[in-house]
Amino acid sequence: MVNQGSPQLVSLVDPYVYQTIKKLIGSRFVIQTVRDTVRGRLIDVKPDHITIEGARNSVCLIRIQHMISVTPDYSERV
């Protein structure tokens, strides 16, 4: 008989991606996700998501698992 306890969420964390992105806090990026493209300044990194400050001080949380690509945003350089 199998013990059927409460369901558990299993989420894989890629420590290389987490540590690399964490070094880039404060930089501006364009992030392509499975749904859309997000542009803004990286303000925080957690093992499962990042926090981006976008236009007009809007804040966006993006799951690392949903990120397809991350590129520097040079569009606002003077």
UniProtKB/Swiss-Prot annotation:
Gene from which this protein is expressed: yuzF
Q: Name one Pfam family in it.
A: DUF2642
Q: Which InterPro entries match?
A: DUF2642
Q: What is this protein called?
A: Uncharacterized protein YuzF
* Domain of life of the native organism: Bacteria
Q: Which organism is it from?
A: Bacillus subtilis (strain 168)
